[in-house]
Amino acid sequence: MTSDVLQLTCDLIARASVTPADAGCQALIADRLSAAGFACEHLRLGAVDNLWATHGSGAPVLVLLGHTDVVPPGPASDWASDPFAPQVRDGVLYGRGAADMKGSVAAFVVAAEQFVAAHPEHPGTLAVLLTSDEEGDAIDGVRHVARLFAERGQQIDWCITGEPSSTERLGDLLRVGRRGSLSGNLIVKGVQGHVAYPHKARNPIHLAAPALAELIARQWDDGFESFPPTSLQISNIHAGTGANNVIPGELQVAFNLRYTPHWNAETLEREIVALLERHALTYTLAWHRSGEPFYTPEGTLRRVAREVLGAFVGAPPEESTGGGTSDARFIAPLGAQCIEVGPVNASIHQVDEHVRVADLEALPALYRTLVERLLV
């Protein structure tokens, strides 16, 4: 017999919600949550669907945060089975979004239904917030909803994000923060010319090399609490026409910083601009701010999560701020304590993405226990 959470996960995977499409996932979830007594508000913006579902009223407000969109699967022929036709083989569920993060979303729904059935008059507010714009541009999703909440004065005390945080076994890692992410696209101007006449040209590669070397060599900080040190990585460099006898007229450099709470995007931008100015480069520089870092210090949410996960796993979880970015970066500035708890992440964004059925079926009880410890 198929469990409720497994069936719901399969129903969600079967909806090919490649970002920013939702493909009906949130409508399915809203129907279930409405039937359980949640008030559901659809906050669509452009091509992005967002769902805000609440049960109860007043403080404290606990949000279960997730996304219904998935990354593209690539050629279906590379998969052992259709990425949008969920299939269980040898106790493992395969399909795009199984781990990231339709399994967590399904577990949120089942846990929320069970919680309000057992505690219909619970203190505070239990909320579910979902978007179809986490894997893409992340502009019209939770970023937009957070701005709306700020305008409304919507309080959020605690936020549990269902991102796949576990490494080897379910619950072995508790994410207590994330680094900020800042990207830059630098164009250094030179003067094109023949390689035999360098005195008539200005090679932007040669001009930029000392500045790039300084950027790469710089130790931005020594880390912060659970954070590794700030890192700058050059991801792309392009110059030239493809001919080996032409000095290029410009150099294009793409880079990204993952940074600790020692910094914010504005101060990093100022530091890098000052460095480029010291090297007297002629350049343009465009920035993209993906999100500021957030960190949840020791407090109620972190303590409860550590105790619940420790009891579940049989050992205290590792508490980490590693990995990429998540939508919690938009909720944390509202004053919320934020953590991330979810399934094993070994197969996310890969061909044959999967989750162990046993892990999936354990998730609702894990989330429900967290909710009960916080709201009852």
From Swiss-Prot:
Residues reported in the UniProt entry to bind Zn(2+) 2: D100, E135, H349
Residues forming the catalytic site: D69, E134
Coiled coil: none
Protein name per its UniProtKB record: Succinyl-diaminopimelate desuccinylase
InterPro entries reported in the protein's UniProt record: ArgE/DapE_CS (IPR001261), Bact_exopeptidase_dim_dom (IPR036264), DapE_proteobac (IPR005941), Peptidase_M20 (IPR002933), Peptidase_M20_dimer (IPR011650), Peptidase_M20A (IPR050072)
Catalytic activity: N-succinyl-(2S,6S)-2,6-diaminopimelate + H2O = (2S,6S)-2,6-diaminopimelate + succinate
TM annotation in the entry: none
Details of cofactor binding: Binds 2 Zn(2+) or Co(2+) ions per subunit.
Role noted for this protein: Catalyzes the hydrolysis of N-succinyl-L,L-diaminopimelic acid (SDAP), forming succinate and LL-2,6-diaminopimelate (DAP), an intermediate involved in the bacterial biosynthesis of lysine and meso-diaminopimelic acid, an essential component of bacterial cell walls.
Native source organism of the sequence: Xanthomonas campestris pv. campestris (strain 8004)
Cofactor: Zn(2+); Co(2+)
Origin organism lineage: Bacteria, Pseudomonadati, Pseudomonadota, Gammaproteobacteria, Lysobacterales
Family in the record: Belongs to the peptidase M20A family. DapE subfamily.
E.C. no: 3.5.1.18
Alphabetized PANTHER family for the sequence: ACETYLORNITHINE DEACETYLASE, N-ACETYL-L-CITRULLINE DEACETYLASE
Quaternary structure and partners: Homodimer.
CDD domains: M20_DapE_proteobac
BP GO annotations: diaminopimelate biosynthetic process; L-arginine biosynthetic process; lysine biosynthetic process via diaminopimelate
Binding site for Zn(2+) 1: H67, D100, E163
Pathway(s) this gene product operates in, as recorded in its UniProt entry: Amino-acid biosynthesis; L-lysine biosynthesis via DAP pathway; LL-2,6-diaminopimelate from (S)-tetrahydrodipicolinate (succinylase route): step 3/3
Molecular functions (GO terms): acetylornithine deacetylase activity; cobalt ion binding; succinyl-diaminopimelate desuccinylase activity; zinc ion binding
Keywords: Amino-acid biosynthesis, Cobalt, Diaminopimelate biosynthesis, Hydrolase, Lysine biosynthesis, Metal-binding, Zinc
